[in-house]
From Swiss-Prot:
Catalytic activity line of the entry: 7-aminomethyl-7-carbaguanine + 2 NADP(+) = 7-cyano-7-deazaguanine + 2 NADPH + 3 H(+)
E.C. designation(s): 1.7.1.13
One GO BP annotation of this record: tRNA modification
Disulfide bonds: none
Protein name as annotated: NADPH-dependent 7-cyano-7-deazaguanine reductase
Higher taxonomy: Bacteria, Pseudomonadati, Pseudomonadota, Betaproteobacteria, Burkholderiales
Pfam families associated with the record: QueF (PF14489), QueF_N (PF14819)
UniProt similarity note: Belongs to the GTP cyclohydrolase I family. QueF type 2 subfamily.
Top EC category: oxidoreductase
HAMAP family in UniProt: QueF_type2
Origin species: Burkholderia ambifaria (strain MC40-6)
Binding residues annotated for NADPH, in chain numbering: 82-83, 249-250
Gene: queF
Active site positions, chain numbering: 181 (thioimide intermediate), 188 (proton donor)
InterPro entries in UniProt: GTP-CH-I_C/QueF (IPR043133), NADPH_dep_7-cyano-7-deazaG_red (IPR050084), QueF (IPR029500), QueF_N (IPR029139), QueF_type2 (IPR016428)
Keywords, in A-Z order: Cytoplasm, NADP, Oxidoreductase, Queuosine biosynthesis
């Protein structure tokens, strides 16, 4: 389904009752073909969605609420357009469910169907809100660098690495990631963490490259996959993982993770800006 046919940028009608048909899937294939991915994926990973505006009625009509987390596998054929996700979650507000498990099972069934793959769902009830973490991405900050730049469209030629020197292992972070919604043009603000083993990447060039997304239009997942592939091709690391955490919009934040080696799922701890 084409993003232009999604609810983005259109007048909003909020559903009075639960409605799974509100979910609008968008195939990943189109954006991946633009990146040269036409067969096996050169990475694996997950898109972590956090939903902070989920509420429903119990069997007696009393409102209930929870924070929901969805783990969408990167190999799923579809993503879900974010405004449609918001409208879908909003449709729960005046609908009755017998239990928290019933809500979770419904979410898992519907979102898995839209994505075309099994999606894991976690719900955190209010009495466990104190357990939710907040911390910044770990790593050496690239933003400490004082530099000039004037490139605001993705330019992989900014990337380089010391190919003749011994490999290193580094974790680098930046809070200066910005891209833009391809339908509405609204800015998406994010932080990005890059962990790699291989020839040392030039830090100034990497920061300029991250900044170069500032005028780029692309969904969160697509931007992270482009970052991953550009670093992989230009710098040739032996191991690479890219994790971005984008700020919240419409009660949802999206946090894509891509890697080419086995490692634990990153912590789903929201940053201060989230």
């Amino acid at each position: 389904m084409n993003p232009e046919h999604s609810p983005l940028g259109k007048a909003t009608v909020y559903a009075a009752q639960y409605d799974a048909s509100l979910l609008f899937p968008i195939p990943r294939a189109g954006a991946r073909e633009q990146l040269g991915i036409t067969s096996a994926l050169p990475f694996f990973g997950t898109d972590i969605w956090n939903a902070y505006e989920l509420s429903w009625l119990n069997a007696r009509g009393k409102p209930q609420l929870a924070v929901a987390t969805f783990y969408v596998p990167a190999e799923s054929p579809n993503i879900v357009e974010s405004k449609s996700f918001k409208l879908y979650l909003g449709s729960f507000a005046q609908s009755k469910f017998d239990s928290l498990d019933a809500v979770r099972d419904t979410l898992k069934r519907d979102v898995s169907a839209a994505c075309g793959a099994s999606v894991s769902v976690q719900l955190v009830s209010p009495h466990d809100f104190g357990k939710l973490q907040m911390e910044e991405l770990d790593g050496l900050s690239l933003d400490r660098l004082d530099l000039d730049t004037d490139v605001y469209e993705p330019d992989p030629s900014l990337l380089s690495a010391a190919q003749e020197e011994a490999p290193v292992e580094e974790t680098l972070v930046s809070d200066l990631l910005r891209s833009n919604c391809p339908v509405t043009g609204q800015p998406d603000w994010g932080s990005v963490q890059i962990h790699y083993v291989g020839p040392q990447i030039d830090h100034a060039g990497l920061l300029r490259y991250i900044i170069s997304f500032r005028n780029h239009t692309g969904f969160h997942e697509q931007c992270v996959e482009r970052i991953f592939l550009d670093i992989l091709h230009a710098c040739k690391p032996l191991k690479l993982a890219v994790y971005a955490r984008y700020t919240r919009r419409g009660g949802l934040d999206i946090n894509p993770f891509r890697t080419n080696y086995n490692q634990p799922m990153p912590d789903n701890a929201r940053t201060a800006r989230q």
